[in-house]
Amino acid sequence: MAGERWRAEGLGEGWAIYVTPRAPIREGRRRLATQNGDGSDAPAYETHPSRHGRREVRFSEEPPEVYGDFEPRAAKERSPGERRTPPEKFRSDSAKEEVRESAYNLRSRQRRQRGPQEAEEMKTRRSTRLEQHSQQAQQQLSPATSGRGLRDAQSLSEDRGEDEPSSQPVTSQTVSKKTVRTPETSVMSEDPISNLCRPPLRSPRPDASIVQHINPFEEGETEDDLESSYSDVTIRIRSRDSVESRDEAAVAAGHHPDSLWGLPHSRGDFTAHENQPSLLPTGCQKNPQEWVEQAVRMRTRMAYNNIQKSDFGNQSPSTSRQQAAVQPPDESSVKIKWWLLILVAALAMGIYWFFHTPVVETTAVQEFQNQMKQLQSKYQSQDEKLWKRGTTFLEKHLNSSLPRPQPAILLLTAAQDAAEVLKCLSEQIADAYSSFRSVRAIRIDGAGKAAQDSDLVKHEVDQELTDGFRNGQNAAVVHRFESLPAGSTLIFYKYCDHENAAFKDVALVLTVLLEEQTLEASLGLKEIEEKVRDFLKVKFTSSDTANSYNHMDPDKLNGLWSRISHLVLPVQPENALKAGSCL
């Protein structure tokens, strides 16, 4: 009758099949192939012209309804007061075997509520079987009896299945032994539930997970079939450091039907990673509560093993990132050390270059100071200003950095009574300045060139100074500067200029002998400077002097004076000095 449902209890597992009748197909149209999901070669039912068309069972999309196979129509229809007739009553033996072989197990209906008396009897039978089974398990000492333990556990589960469905968590159901062990059969004979189930998403958690696949046995299977079905227990452990391809392969093998052919289904087959001990013999002998406790212990042990494995080589990504984060500082520290080494070397070279020349010059200054002290001890009649100002002026020039900004020009003057002292002291001061180089200062006598041509004297003076300075001499003394031809003195623009002097690291000592007989010691340096200036102006610009007008003028003289008058110091006569010899 349309709209009515019937239930067939079969397979001894409490499974029920819901089917929905379909309206008859019109006459003369060939019925489609069976939709039993097993892909068998059974001929499709056809509508005979002499009788009404049979109703066809199709897949229903409603959750409570299940896609059943073809059964006699009398099995589907029943009266409201009649008892439901199991569908197996109308099947032939071959049809029953075919249904069993096709693993046509779909969604199960809810368990029917059992009465208190029936539940008590089931508990009594279960406890009795558990005690018997535990006694038999104690006698199993060798691994060779694992097959027997599997069969005992299978028989225990079979008896329990008659009373109530198995309470163990079943994640997926596989096909029977004949379906699994025959790769040559058609793909359509695979488990329809596996075809309809959506593969679960990959768990993002890195903890190890245990996936168990247990084949529920069916009625009528042989002992080998039960043993083979119970041997399909696989435990897969996915850790954080597992290879991604291996992880995906493990997930695909657990949830896709194509992986059924790749799984080994031999007796006692048990796959476990991380060298976990075999759990099958003891697991089949435990009740559901012990199964849960064992699963918890497994997860704890595998998590600990993953931690140890991460510590001893297969480090986690976080540890790798930390090491990668620590490694760049090591490389940077090496680079910093190299840069520090280069910096220290450059600093050492700079210090050496900076102090090398000053050390040399300091030695030259010390040598000059020693020479000046000796002269001071010899010429005791000289004014203190001469030693103090003269020594400081020349020391400052020696200590100045290279290249020096300008040459050192020292002008010494004296009266007629100190002419010999002026000549000796000027030469000795110039030699003291160049004493570090152990060379003798350049000497030019102006009195011997007084009668010569101005241009010729100019050329000779220029030649002597240039050759001497280029040959390493750094000091020169010009005696009787006032006796040189007026025009020839213009060459000293070249050597005494403040900014554009030809040689700046040299010292020139000029002497001017006044016409006065005695130079008073009470005169100050400013007065002595004015006296020397007036005297040179008279000598170089007087109209009585031949050719002086054509070669020198007051403007040129003022420019020359500004260049040679850096420091003007007086020289006093010495009583100990003998004629013709220096102290």
Swiss-Prot record:
Task of the protein: Required for nuclear membrane integrity. Induces TOR1A and TOR1B ATPase activity and is required for their location on the nuclear membrane. Binds to A- and B-type lamins. Possible role in membrane attachment and assembly of the nuclear lamina.
Compositional bias (Polar residues): 166-188
Phosphoserine carried by residues: 60, 134, 142, 155, 157, 189, 228, 231, 242, 316
Disordered: region residues: 23-208
Record: glycosylation sites: 399
PANTHER family per UniProt: TORSIN-1A-INTERACTING PROTEIN, TORSIN-1A-INTERACTING PROTEIN 1
Subcellular locations according to the entry: Nucleus inner membrane
Keywords attached to this entry: Coiled coil, Glycoprotein, Isopeptide bond, Membrane, Nucleus, Phosphoprotein, Transmembrane, Transmembrane helix, Ubl conjugation
Record bears the keyword Nucleus: yes
Domain of life: Eukaryota
Molecular function as annotated in GO: ATPase activator activity; ATPase binding; cytoskeletal protein binding; lamin binding
Similarity-based family: Belongs to the TOR1AIP family.
Coiled-coil residue windows: 360-388
Protein name, entry field: Torsin-1A-interacting protein 1
Gene: Tor1aip1
Residues on Nuclear side: 1-339
Gene3D superfamilies per record: 3.40.50.12190
Biological process, per Gene Ontology: nuclear membrane organization; positive regulation of ATP-dependent activity; protein localization to nuclear envelope; protein localization to nucleus
Oligomeric form and interacting partners: Interacts with ATP1B4. Interacts with TOR1A (ATP-bound). Interacts with TOR1B, TOR2A and TOR3A. Interacts with VIM.
Perinuclear space compartment segments: 361-583
